[in-house]
Amino acid sequence: MTHTHDHEHDHNHEPDYITLVEENGNESLFQILITIDGQEEFGKNYVVLQPTEFEEDEQGLIDVLAYSFTENADGTEGDLQPIPEDAEDEWDMIEEVFNSFMDEQED
C-alpha cells in the first residue's frame, strides 16, 4: 500500500535545539531535525528530535523521538505531547515525511 502525503516541513539549515526535562528533573538536549505541518490532516504539528549525545547502533542507526506540539502565541515555546502508539495514520505520515527529509540530507 502506498501513501502520498503533501505536508510542509521545515528545512532549517542552522540547527535548533530543545531541552526536555524528565519527571525526575534530568535535562537532555535534543536537536530539532524536522517540524511537520499536519494541521490539515490531523489538526496537529509534529517535531522529530535527535539527542545531541547519542551512540549509533550496530547498523549505524540513531534513535529519534517524535512528538506532536502546540506552540504558544509568540512561537518561541510550546507543549509537546506524546503521539499515541495506535495512531497508525499519524505515524505513517511522520515516517514518510522523515524518510524523505533524510533522503534529501544524503543528497
UniProtKB/Swiss-Prot annotation:
Family as reported in the entry's similarity comment: Belongs to the UPF0473 family.
Pfam families given in the database record: DUF1292
InterPro entries linked: UPF0473
Signal peptide start and end residues: none
HAMAP family recorded: UPF0473
Transmembrane segments: none
Name assigned to this protein: UPF0473 protein LACR_0139
